[in-house]
Curated annotation (Swiss-Prot):
Annotated GO CC locations: cytosolic large ribosomal subunit
Family that this chain belongs to: Belongs to the eukaryotic ribosomal protein eL31 family.
GO BP annotations, alphabetical order: cytoplasmic translation
InterPro entries xrefs: Ribosomal_eL31 (IPR000054), Ribosomal_eL31_CS (IPR020052), Ribosomal_eL31_dom_sf (IPR023621)
Pfam families reported for this sequence: Ribosomal_L31e
A molecular function (GO) term: structural constituent of ribosome
Protein name, entry field: Large ribosomal subunit protein eL31
Keywords for this protein: Ribonucleoprotein, Ribosomal protein
SMART domains hit by this protein: Ribosomal_L31e (SM01380)
Superkingdom field: Archaea
The UniProt record lists the keyword Ribonucleoprotein: yes
Amino acid sequence: MEEERIYTIPLRDVTNKSPTTKRAPRAMRAIRDFLKKHMKSDIVKLDNSINEKVWERSLNKIPAKVRVKVVKEGDVVKATLIE
């Protein structure tokens, strides 16, 4: 059974709590951790569009929030960017 949800993932905490040279990698980890927590699964696959959105303005200027569409198929969670 497939389960589909739309989330707005806040990344403001990542911006405020990390040095400028580590913001994008930490944002990617924060997205993955958010989806693990909310979808209750350990296997999370992020689409390349999410990666491009976070890294769009370089390492230290990440977006404040990201909207993603998440589909859970069994134990696997797949996320794609909305916009």
